[in-house]
Structure formats: structure tokens, C-alpha cells
Amino acid sequence: MEMSQRRFKVGDRIRIIRMDGEPEYSGREGVIEHISTAYEPAGILEQLHGTWGGLAVQPSMDTIEIIQQGE
């Protein structure tokens, strides 16, 4: 994903609908504090880090929704 194609921004409030392999994260909400890039064999993955817990969300693999856009 190119930087200009990002849908998510620092400050956005999201809800995790489904996190791959982590059912206890379903329904959690939080604010995106940092966005990073992971270089995996499958390609470049965007990772969202925030106030919902210790794990990063990967929008290409996990199901999330923006519930409030940051300013």
C-alpha cells in the first residue's frame, strides 16, 4: 500500500470487528497513536498501533471500522 493510499490516520477512533487469531480483541475500541510498515514475505503491511491493547491491527488482514475521524 502506498503512503498516499492510506485510509487510516493518527487520531482516528476505530472499532475492531475481528482480529485474525485474537478473538478477545473483537469489539475493542481505541485511538490510533502510530502507523508503521511491516515488511513481510507476503508484501508490505500497514500496521496500526493504539489504545485498544498491546497488539497492532493490520487493516489488510483484520476487520476494523472507523467510528470517529481524528482532527
Q: What do the PLM-derived regions correspond to, one by one?
A:
Residues K9-G70:
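Basic/aromatic-rich interaction segments and small domains that mediate binding to polyanionic partners
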